[in-house]
Amino acid sequence: MSIRRFALAALASALIAGPALAADTLLNVSYDPTRELYVEFNDAFNKHWQAQGHEPIKIQQSHGGSGKQARAVIDGLRADVVTLALAGDIDELHRLGKLIPEDWQTRLPDASTPYTSTIVFLVRKGNPKGIKDWDDLVKPGVEVITPNPKTSGGARWNFLAAWAYAQQKYGSEAKAQEFVQKLYKNVPVLDTGARGSTITFVNNQIGDVLLAWENEAHLAIAESDRGAFEIVAPSRSILAEPPVAVVERVASRRGTL
């Protein structure tokens, strides 16, 4: 099953769990590079929903850095559903906002994780800097584009992938920390989210390599001039597991639970 089909099945179960919807509008607060996924998803879900005899619903989307999005929900953004980049961001909705139960991750199948992804490198045509693996990212003169891990879930996956590579290769946390510090010294700009970093790299032509979600890298290639970019798969990356949750406190108040 493709990532998109699996995401569709899992999030649909979140949206239709419990009593029938009492409102005609839902808000999905999501992380940065999922806009295109959920445009397709929303259309497919609505067709499925209407085929079961229900009235069509409107599904609104909000996108941004995962950590920033979690903060917005805690501060009052009325999300019915959150689909964020890391479980830790959704945990904050319980810890700081009491918007979801502590055991939210047990409420849906597969630990509320409908799909997985990974982190890859996106380089320019011909790979002029010869970037093949993580070690190439810390070389002098190589500009690395990655978002700010303080606001972006994808950036934290990037950080963890680099750390895991260095720790395995060099054998200690101290060496891993040193490696990651060297990598970030090669980052000229820290955008707040993954899509912002893609725009910096693709549209603004800044940097030699973009650390990207796999789907974001493929999208950049599909929407750019043929052959303008290439994907490089590093020798070691990370299994990213973006989870979903119903924001039960908000959905209950709005009658969408």
List PLM regions with ranges.
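N-terminal segment of the mature folded domain
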Residues: 23-151
